[in-house]
């Protein structure tokens, strides 16, 4: 059972935060296909005041809203390969008109995590092929 991801244990070096918009985070792309990291904070912004996120933390998952016809759904999707625009788009999709009062973000703290375990965990949450935030390979 330990070889498969589960909701009942946490991955070392991964943490979750819930923030309202504007988040107050300045993201920067690591490199193509490697995701985004926290480059800095907006001075006095929510993320800085909350104090949980650190510069250098890597965004590994985020809630996003997907709209199909007259229906919508919000889910946590892996963000490890997102480029800057995709990450910002996913964050921005969490709008009050869809009943989203916050954005849930999961971060990896480099040096405190096991990247292989993190990858295995998030492979479980890989979005379906029709997800608008799924990167084209």
Feature roles, as predicted:
Residues 1-137:
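Intrinsically disordered, Ser/Thr/Pro/Gly-rich linkers and terminal tails that flank
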């Amino acid at each position: 059972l330990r070889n498969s991801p589960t909701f009942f244990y946490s991955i070392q070096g991964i943490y979750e935060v819930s923030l309202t918009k504007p988040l107050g985070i300045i993201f920067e792309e690591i490199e193509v296909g490697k995701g985004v990291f926290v480059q800095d904070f907006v001075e006095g912004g929510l993320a800085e005041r909350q104090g949980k996120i650190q510069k250098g933390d890597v965004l590994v998952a985020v809630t996003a809203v997907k709209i199909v016809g007259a229906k919508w759904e919000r889910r946590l999707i892996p963000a490890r390969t997102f480029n800057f625009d995709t990450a910002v788009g996913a964050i921005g999709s969490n709008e009050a008109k869809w009943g989203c009062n916050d954005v849930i973000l999961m971060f990896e703290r480099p040096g405190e995590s096991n990247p292989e375990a993190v990858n295995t965990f998030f492979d479980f949450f890989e979005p379906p092929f029709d997800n608008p935030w799924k990167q084209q390979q």
